[in-house]
Design a protein with these regions (language model features):
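Hydrophobic transmembrane alpha-helices of multi-pass small-molecule transport proteins
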Residues: 6, 98, 125, 139-158, ...
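Hydrophobic alpha-helical transmembrane segments of multi-pass integral membrane proteins
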Residues: 31-35, 61-76, 140-146, 166-173, ...
Length: 304
């Protein structure tokens, strides 16, 4: 997907500001590619490593704890000027923070019920539709159709359907949230300086998730659990944000968008390595279809 549209991931790991295409050196591009891969790996392996926390505290509790740590750490670094923002700025971060909290909770609820690779592929349909329709490319609906076929292949292992209806619905909800997140981050990124928009939206997300997450997690908290969650908050979303921000300064946004299309494949790989979620050849082909559809939509959007 093109970075002009995808300015945030499942966990807010991407930049909140649009970046123009650049023509950096070959060495800079290579470093940017490495940073993109590292960012996607952080996001997907971070999601896989979150499985024990989701089981211990529930999806709402895991979301709340991670947002509290991430928002607190970033607020200390950025020091947003809370009292100086206008009404329109507040409305923007309130909307973005609410969407972020709901999106993350929905995604965690999905991966608690269905394989990670399937959840990521379904969720990816949201930004894929934005990339297809956002540039007026109604004729390019072929790409979302390809991706949907890929999702169907992922959902069937040759013997039975691997997902359940609640998990699939949560993944669809996360995808819808991601699509809204993309549209909102463009507005918030333009309304704030530097990282203030990201910091404020994470603070709002932490507050929004508190009524649900605190009740789910508070009675189960341990010292080791807090350290584990703090580490995961660094892994997602803070480290991916930094990696992607630096990567975008070293490579064209079109190349960045194509690379980020690999995220469903990395999600499936993380599920296999961390969660022992194997894939059949047809499921691998389904993942390839989703990735190919994303790359195709990115290329046509860049041309359009």
């Amino acid at each position: 997907m093109d970075q002009k549209l995808i300015e945030g991931g499942t966990d807010g790991g991407a930049a909140l500001m649009p970046h123009p295409d650049v023509a950096p050196s070959t060495g800079g591009i290579a470093a940017g590619v490495l940073m993109c891969v590292m960012s996607m790996s952080c996001i997907q392996f971070g999601s896989a490593l979150s499985a024990p926390i989701i089981n211990a505290y529930g999806p709402a509790g895991a979301t709340w704890l991670r947002l509290v740590f991430a928002s607190g750490a970033l607020a200390i670094i950025v020091r947003p000027k809370i009292m100086s923002y206008s009404r329109s700025q507040w409305l923007g971060v309130l909307a973005l923070g609410t969407v972020s909290a709901l999106m993350t909770t929905a995604f965690f609820s999905a991966i608690a019920r269905i394989p990670l690779g399937l959840a990521v592929a379904i969720e990816f349909l949201g930004p894929l539709l934005v990339a297809t329709l956002g540039f007026g490319l109604s004729r390019q609906l072929l790409w979302p159709i390809f991706a949907a076929i890929g999702v169907l292949l992922l959902a069937y292992d040759g013997e039975e359907w691997v997902g359940n209806l609640p998990g699939i619905l949560f993944a669809i909800g996360a995808g819808a949230g991601w699509a809204c997140y993309i549209l909102l981050t463009k507005k918030v990124g333009n309304a704030f300086q530097g990282l203030e928009g990201l910091s404020m939206s994470l603070l709002v997300a932490a507050v929004v998730s508190t009524p649900f997450g605190f009740a789910s997690a508070a009675s189960h908290l341990t010292g080791f659990g807090l350290l584990e969650i703090a580490g995961l908050a660094l892994l997602v979303p803070l480290l991916p944000y930094v990696l992607e921000m630096v990567a975008l300064r070293r490579m064209p946004t079109s190349s960045f968008g194509i690379l980020m299309s690999l995220e469903p494949a990395i999600g499936a790989f993380a599920g296999f390595i961390i969660l022992s979620q194997p894939m059949t050849p047809s499921q691998m082909f389904g993942t390839a279809l989703v990735v190919s559809a994303s790359i195709g939509a990115t290329i046509f959007a860049a041309k359009g």
